């Protein structure tokens, strides 16, 4: 029995073609349901990394159903990893994109929804972007997309709400480079003190994504230190988040 307010994910098998992937699902009542794509499978990327775990917790606490999963060949998921061990190159992601689509199908069936929000972290951001045109995805969130070494220029063509989070000290996600890839209507949040792992900024990361989910494509009501949108940046809007050092408040699930 799950008590009211208790955070308890359920282990699920996610079908991806002929193989089964390991996943963790938590039910919720608010739209949209959210699927979370983890980082690079040969660099320790799994659904249990702190960023994915924090996002699943924060989004679930806000009332949204979540599904996080492991790619083929990772953890208890069937299949094999096709990437070269030890490489930081993204390479062919067709298999991982299929895995994401399988997870989306599972989440749609579980929630009886028509669309999901697809959230990708690092390598997972490339996977989400590759599937962004799918009708089953109505908005995307990209956390620390590795724009150094991978082509994210397709971001300009995404005609759906987009939220991007950039860490100020991430050598794979240069904020200036990322700004040049954003299209009209995108929202970009910068956490200057964070690195690629967001270990000291996990609460801020979770809160920013939850706030954006609540407002959709509108600017989240956060610690906004840029009073006006940048007028020369292609129509996207940017906010800057700073660690206030204060405890993170409980989220109100009734609004």
Regions found by a protein language model. Give the residues of each.
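An N-terminal hydrophobic leader/cap segment in hydrolases
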Residues: 1-15, 21-27, 118, 221-236, ...
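Serine-hydrolase catalytic machinery in alpha/beta-hydrolase-like enzymes
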Residues: 14-113
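Long, low-complexity, intrinsically disordered segments
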Residues: 234-255
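Acidic catalytic loop of the alpha/beta-hydrolase fold
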Residues: 168-173, 196-197
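Short beta-strand/loop motif that positions the catalytic acidic residue
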Residues: 158-159, 163-166, 170
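Post-His helix in hydrolase/transferase enzymes
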Residues: 199-213
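Short glycine-rich catalytic loops that host catalytic nucleophiles or stabilize transition states
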Residues: 189-195
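Primarily recognizes the serine-hydrolase "nucleophile elbow" in alpha/beta-hydrolase
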Residues: 98-160
